Each structure stands twice: as structure tokens, then as C-alpha cells.
Amino acid sequence: MTRSNIEIIRNIYGAFETGDMAAFSAALAPDIVWNEAENYPYADRNPYVGAQAIMEGVFARTAQDFDGFAVSMTDLIDGGDRVVALGRYTGTSRTTGAPLDVQAAHVWTLADGKVVQFQQHIDTLGTARTMRLAG
């Protein structure tokens, strides 16, 4: 029996939460195309292609910039080959000490049980203010 796309995405968030990056990466297609939201601090290398590029360009930088970074997606919406996740990012900026608490939405595209594309939508101004990248 195959898992539903919602289950796959729910498991991805669970793997991220527990730090199981091997399980996270296993859910991604080898040539996944990952895009951070325009004007987000880590969008400078868009698109990220492949799990290693995502780990180094997004997750390692996030861990470097934030203490206690967490992604809490409260709603998962089934759109067939797409799953939309709605929730929040939280953490504390290591540079400023300011708390991060911003809305986020993710659009995941799946094919054959693997994530082939990811698009982040987020409060980029709130993030920039937390990091003191904007006034």
C-alpha cells in the first residue's frame, strides 16, 4: 500500500523536527528543485537542486542564524500531486537576540512518492526585521 502525499509531507516535518535529516532527504527526489521565498535571506542561491544543496544552503545557514528554530505547520491541504502546508517559523536570532515568529506556507509537489519541487512563502519582512536586515 502506498502512503498518501499528506502522510509523506507529515513525515518530512516529523523528520525535520527530530533532526533526522537522512529520513528528510530520503523523501526527496534526487533532482528536487527547492525555492526559498523571494527576498528571504536564503533565496540568494535559488533554486537549490538536490538534498545536499538544501542542507548546506538552507538548513545549515538557518542553524547558524537561529537558536531553537522550529517549523510548526498546523494545516496540511491535499491538492493531489501538491500539498500545501500552513503554519509558523519560530526561533531566536543569534545575531540580535530577537524572537522570530512569522507565518509561513509551503507548497510541496510530489511524483511517484517523492518530493520533486518545494516553494516557500513566508513573512520575509518579519524575518528581516528579526535578523536586523531591514528597518
Please place each PLM-identified region on the residue numbering:
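Gly/Ser/Thr-rich helix-start
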Residues: 20, 51, 98
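Hydrophobic pocket/interface hotspot
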Residues: 9-12, 23-28, 32, 50, ...
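A beta-strand edge to alpha-helix "cap/lid" segment located at domain peripheries
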Residues: 1-4, 59-135
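A solvent-exposed, acidic/Ser-Thr-rich amphipathic alpha-helical stretch
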Residues: 30-80
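Short, low-complexity N-terminal intrinsically disordered segments enriched in polar/charged residues
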Residues: 1-30, 131-135
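Short, mixed-charge, low-aromatic patches
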Residues: 10-19, 42-45, 62-66, 86-88
